[in-house]
Amino acid sequence: MAETAPLRVQLIARTEFTVPPDVPWETDAEGGAALVEFAGRACYQSWSKPNPRTATNASYLRHIIEVGHLSVLEHASVSFYITGISRSCTHELIRHRHFSYSQLSQRYVPENDSQVVVPPGIEGDAELEGLFTAAADASRAAYAELLAKLEAKLMGDEPREGRATLRRKQARQAARSVLPNATETRIVVTGNYRAWRHFIAMRASEHADLEIRRLAIACLRELVAVAPAVFADFEIYPLADGTEVATTPLVTEA
């Protein structure tokens, strides 16, 4: 029986920043948040912080978001390793073109023992989960049978290991066509702060697919821990159905 995979979002990289020694400026933040402030001040050479209302890093970053000077957010980035996400969800995720992606390859990695992600609309309903599991098991059995027969057909009597590797890849790329959209995949996603804000604004909405909304909320919680001055304006709150959304009163992009 197919095992289910829970969503997991792991922070694996973030921006570091070093102030140039010849610039007479310091701030009360570090990493990406400091870099964003530095980039903004570099536009105007305002190293002396002439405006007391934007003297702190948090107040400066809030101001640039309020006025829509979002290009400076592009200098800092965060990378996540995301597991327990379905193929159907990553098909939506990769539509965000300002992210960079490296995803598990079904051509190189056999899916005989792959896990599945239960759609939120099915989750918790015993009857629906039974139907879902049966369908997932049937597709995986068909995959295994197709893979075995394709490998036997394509390998033939070719002795060379290089050709054998190619034939196995060709067998997997054909057999994977019967795997369900619910098949778990794993993906590294890197994006700058501006791209992450856009993703959260679009996908943490009530109108987004629930699986990718859960992903957006999970990413947001990690992002707030990394750069609160950039992401803490998003408020997470529950809906009547128990699911969560996130909204912000500040500038976002459609």
Swiss-Prot record:
Keyword list, A-Z: FAD, Flavoprotein, Methyltransferase, NADP, Nucleotide biosynthesis, Transferase
SUPFAM superfamilies assigned: Thymidylate synthase-complementing protein Thy1
Active site per UniProt: R203
Biological process (GO), any one: methylation
Recorded catalytic activity of this chain's protein: dUMP + (6R)-5,10-methylene-5,6,7,8-tetrahydrofolate + NADPH + H(+) = dTMP + (6S)-5,6,7,8-tetrahydrofolate + NADP(+)
Any single Pfam family the record assigns to this protein: Thy1
Domain ThyX: residue ranges: 7-237
Pathway: Pyrimidine metabolism; dTTP biosynthesis
UniProt keyword Zinc, yes or no: no
Sequence positions that bind FAD: S71, R95, H96, R97, Q103, N192, Y193, R194, H198
UniProt-recorded Gene Ontology molecular function terms: flavin adenine dinucleotide binding; NADPH binding; thymidylate synthase (FAD) activity; thymidylate synthase activity
Cysteines engaged in disulfide bonds, as pairs: none
ThyX motif, short sequence motif: residues: 95-105
Cofactor annotation remark: Binds 4 FAD per tetramer. Each FAD binding site is formed by three monomers.
Family statement drawn from the similarity comment of this UniProt entry: Belongs to the thymidylate synthase ThyX family.
Subunit structure: Homotetramer.
Name under which the protein is recorded: Flavin-dependent thymidylate synthase
Upper taxonomic lineage: Bacteria, Bacillati, Actinomycetota, Actinomycetes, Mycobacteriales
Annotated gene: thyX
